[in-house]
């Protein structure tokens, strides 16, 4: 089963259709197909919070399983009516002016004769400036300035860390933690041993028991740094445990404030499930609150002004792209299939949450289309299709020839044609940016994905429960991460020659770790709902089979430990020094992993997650930020 299948949202009538609307009758994608409106409903299997399993006998006499998924919740008329004043050219002119002013701020920090620099806090100023533009999602405008600042900071870096300024001899926890995180993320060689030098005689991070704002900020940056850990870095594990405990205790003692908001956000989303656009939106609110309290300096106010304007200009582009996505979804004929989930708006929210570069529209649109196709295939293989039908479809995908649809049942013909045409169209578009035909790469990934799906369908059909290792290896392919990443990545304006592709696609460690995280995390959040739909095999059930006497809690603990270790491995694959494969070539695939992980963050029930996802769509796509 694919884990790239966003969960349902709670209803909100002013924005999208009511859950109580009547079930759509299946219509033809090519010709009339089996309709569930005439099916005889069977006895429901145990319900799973917001979706259960219903058996239905179609009018051709075939008994089918359907997931009782609700229809699309985001009304197409509402989406097509979206508008924004920030499309006007005057806003672009203002943006360019502000970009120039922020560059001047960066340059003043680097002035040899001092400028705004103070020898007691210049290193912290450089790092704070870089941190601000990155968290606000505007760093793409300042790559040259960021490198100058980080080169300057790194020139003072030592095995004991750094002080807040070039003339400060004593190591400063806040500056060292912030510096370690940013430098490591930008590919500089830094070692976690710097934190050993910040311990007291008892082997603990030295800090007072008082929760002062300055100390809390230092521990917050220590926590953020600890999340960029590599395997085997024990001091980073210690720092994470210590800082997380400290911050949770601090939340109990400090008043509700911008600082408490920042702590709550970082604790909730950490690094591996953080969406950059959601972080930008949240950090804008935090800095805005500081502005009201007159806690911001003039430079940060200028950066904030640019961030708000950039957010809203991209918001206007989001509206256009979302309209395009909605038209594609509608024209595909998928709205008439009532056995599939319709999550194109949620998928768009995810991808626009990880890539806010205006020129990457084709990447975002390709990602949404591919993820929606994955969801259609997931629902077809996991529930609706019979095993004989799925064997025919699997063979047709391998042949990659529309003439093979003659042997498919009617509902599969339409699915196949949309899949075939969409993938071919995207491959043709990708050839413009890659300078070569990439279709074979994508076909190989698609065949592996469909093959893994088919194996799981055979397991469901026969009632077979595999071993953990057998399930996990197959599950990495069926997670959908590889196929969801590969085709959209080719649409970027970044060349991906074969030697780079080998480092991010199958069978690279990078691809293996990303697929592993999605499969493991998806199973911990969805295994109960999957079992309710008749899908017994999961990481949890297979672990319990391999370890008689173990409980679900034992299985979850084991899998959560696997996830934590695999995240560290993926961090290392992203950030390891490699002159042949720059970080920028791996960043989109890594961010897709983070984005997909976000949708399974702390998810133990669809009701809570529904509200969270709904709010995410509204906050990052539908609503502009107040100016």
UniProtKB/Swiss-Prot annotation:
Binding, Mg(2+) 2: 378, 382
Residue ranges of the motif DDXXD motif: 378-382
Binding site for Mg(2+) 3: 530
Keyword Protein transport appears in the UniProt entry: no
Cofactor(s) this protein requires: Mg(2+); Mn(2+)
One Gene Ontology term, aspect cellular component: chloroplast
Subcellular location: Plastid, Chloroplast
Transit peptide endpoints, chain numbering: 1-36
Factors inducing expression: By jasmonic acid (MeJA).
Record's keyword terms, sorted: Chloroplast, Lyase, Magnesium, Manganese, Metal-binding, Plastid, Transit peptide
InterPro entries linked to this entry: Isoprenoid_synthase_dom_sf, Terpene_cyclase-like_1_C, Terpene_cyclase_plant_C1, Terpene_synth_N, Terpene_synth_N_sf, Terpene_synthase-like, Terpene_synthase_metal-bd, Terpenoid_cyclase/PrenylTrfase
Pfam families assigned: Terpene_synth, Terpene_synth_C
Comment field (misc): Expressed only in resistant trees, not detected in genomic DNA of susceptible trees.
Name assigned to this protein: Carene synthase 2, chloroplastic
Gene source species: Picea sitchensis (Sitka spruce)
Upper lineage: Eukaryota, Viridiplantae, Streptophyta, Embryophyta, Tracheophyta
Gene: TPS-3car2
